[in-house]
């Protein structure tokens, strides 16, 4: 029931009560003798109850001293229904009486069920219902009092009092209440023919139970007591009333409980608001908090919110779910074995390392390996991010560190994992820009003390992950705190095969997962575990978008293009001249790489725009080379410059499309000259650049810098000359490939073989492209067979020679 409907019902009930009261008073003064029947409906019982209370107000007021006069309220069915749990059921029964028939039997069965269930009294449910009833009952009481306040007492002016009440002699006595209001009590049996104005109605009939000689009918404001007495005395003198018959005046101090209650309403509201704010602060009014963790109460800001996993938790990750980092997994498993079987190591006098730092590029599986440790260890695992220690308030970081290790010691043996520890573990005072004493340093100092300081206890193993070990404080990396640094690199081709097998098990493929895992592993060199998971998910999305029932190799190739090059934009507006320029540019890359010995084998070339700036690209399948020779880097430079050379030779104009190629060439050539020591003029010197690019001064002189710049220009010019000569030799083939690109937009290696023929260079070992076509396990078996045959042939030859 809404408050608006309740207020409207009360207003209608008040009007009907006045009409009913007029009918009870017997038609005096033009009051209507009857009132229309009360409307029945959803609020019928409430309106009838309020009407009965207001209509009999006079009877209750006169008999307030008699407790029995309230019995009619307690005996009222509507009154009892307000405070009964069965009100809704009875009300529902009334509303359903209109629809007889099948509903009768259901009502009887429901009433039996409800009566049987009502016998079981639930204290907590009753308390909850009582709390829910407080606010509606309080509001209902205020509305009831406001409705009952509109009584028959009439406010008049002093002039009306003088002319219409005092002059005819109708005033019995006056009661001045609270020195502000004069209540006029009219005689019980006045002479009605002396009343001159019909606007004031005095009733001679009495209601049942009223025996007082006078009744309180009128009131007016007096302003002040002295002025009121003077006015009244002057009025009585003017009327020539005998002083012995002056109207008696009494003064009272009345406390109207409704007004007194209303005085405290603002205070109660303020207290209630403060209480609600307090509850909100404890439950929801928060400060900080990581994603998925919610916020922190302002009163518990020093406490740390830890993700705690135990052996009974669901959605565990095990070591079998981690692939591509076998060596790192083996080292982490030693911690788990020690926690499960500590006696085996203690008998040999060994101590478990206090901590291990997981180091590696982003997406290699550091956090996943920590989750697997939590699932396999069988001990409490507490996980937190390094940024969760930092807050806007001073001293919160150290407090949270203490709270974290205190909780870990309470449930020892346990494992604590701090992800992205570089947020609090940066070197203190590095470079003179960090300030003397900040919140991060205080947090780091507290972490150092908790890991290895006075008062530390055994049983807590600390794991941490970071991709920036070079910026960590040396005190944090020393033995006794992080005894081990476990490096997790990007997986090789076999590691990628294992990772693909894990993710492909969850997909619906048209062939076996091993078929795809081998070929996709060869197709994705340099991909980390997170990139592989993204490729598998993108392939599933592309298959679903194309209404496919199974995922095929075409979907995986499109997913790899999406991850490498960005979103495909076939609707991008490109002019014919620009499209032709892009086609010749990409064909120049393809031809240059095809006829260079140390260049990477080409997978496909396309002129479909992708990403934000790429109008086309050539995709290669590089090998997982750990070392690069000078000749390999030179051929890669020539292949990168093939696009610019094709534009100059075939179109006669150069464009800005080679900007990215020139950037790669510049970076590659500077590395050869200044880092790898390939230049004879610079010598065997290496000047590696910092990754952050922040250097106040160069580690070499200006003369050396000039030599480096000159060498880089000469090397790039030499590579460009060779590339131009190569493009001129195969000018017709470049044009054919460009026309095919304009026609098909995408060319694979098979299409290039038809135009260019087989590559003139053969490698002794299979390339990643060969593994992509055939699968590397078959190649390994064939290679082992060839080696065994070669060994047998050599031994046979030696025997014959002997």
Curated annotation (Swiss-Prot):
The keyword Protein transport does not apply. Its EC number is 3.4.24.-. Residues 1-23 have a biased composition (Low complexity). Its cofactor is Zn(2+). ATP binds at residues 360-367. It is found in: Mitochondrion inner membrane. HAMAP family: FtsH. This is ATP-dependent zinc metalloprotease FTSH 3, mitochondrial.
